[in-house]
Curated annotation (Swiss-Prot):
PANTHER family listed in its UniProt record: PEPTIDE DEFORMYLASE, PEPTIDE DEFORMYLASE, MITOCHONDRIAL
Official protein name in the record: Peptide deformylase 1
InterPro entries linked to this entry: Peptide_deformylase, Peptide_deformylase_sf
Swiss-Prot/TrEMBL catalytic activity: N-terminal N-formyl-L-methionyl-[peptide] + H2O = N-terminal L-methionyl-[peptide] + formate
UniProt keyword GTP-binding, yes or no: no
GO molecular function: metal ion binding; peptide deformylase activity
UniProt function note: Removes the formyl group from the N-terminal Met of newly synthesized proteins. Requires at least a dipeptide for an efficient rate of reaction. N-terminal L-methionine is a prerequisite for activity but the enzyme has broad specificity at other positions.
Pfam family, one: Pep_deformylase
CC cofactor note: Binds 1 Fe(2+) ion.
Length: 169
């Protein structure tokens, strides 16, 4: 297991759609383990494979610090909202350091996918975990949370990014 480099805003891999996983092999298990290490090292609650430069439809999550929270991974994730109810809250991203903004997401979603052995998995999530599922699946579709912001919030976020030391290396 290893901590991998988190790709930052501006890297083309972050705006590329990840490929479906068809081979459930040792390299996939290693990727998942490395993603957990990377997420934990960075202090995140979720991480998509393209954030570590791998275009495979995999994400890991850990909301176990909250009551009823879970820790796990999902391969080839698909989600659907269970109601039209939404939540709005601060959202950030390991690939866009120092930027957080109010983002609206569905409150409750049903997630389905596969585990590292190819077995079906699924559950209903709400709150932070539902937000995480939507955020990480967006990543796998090549969509950054900045696209979910209203124009004024996006402009402010882009100003912070352009002024940041990490972006101007």
């Amino acid at each position: 297991m290893a901590v991998r480099e988190v790709r930052l805003f501006g890297d083309p891999v972050l705006v590329s759609r990840a490929d479906e996983v068809v081979d459930f092999d040792e390299s996939l298990s290693t990727l998942i383990d490395d993603m957990f290490d990377t997420m934990e090292d960075a202090g995140g609650v979720g991480l998509a494979a393209n954030q570590v430069g791998v275009l495979r439809r995999v994400f890991v999550f850990d909301t176990s610090h909250q009551e009823g929270g879970l820790r796990g991974h999902v391969i080839n994730p698909v989600w659907e909202p269970l109601t039209e109810d939404t939540q709005t809250g601060k959202e950030g991203c390991l690939s866009i350091p120092d930027v957080s903004a109010e983002t609206t997401r569905y409150e409750t979603v049903r997630l389905s996918g596969q585990d590292r052995d190819g077995n079906p998995v699924g559950f209903v999530a709400n709150g932070l975990l539902a937000r995480c599922i939507q955020h990480e699946t967006d990543h796998l579709d090549g969509v950054l949370f900045l696209k979910r912001l209203d124009p004024a919030e996006r402009k402010a976020a882009m100003g912070v990014i352009r002024a940041s030391a990490w972006f101007n290396k």
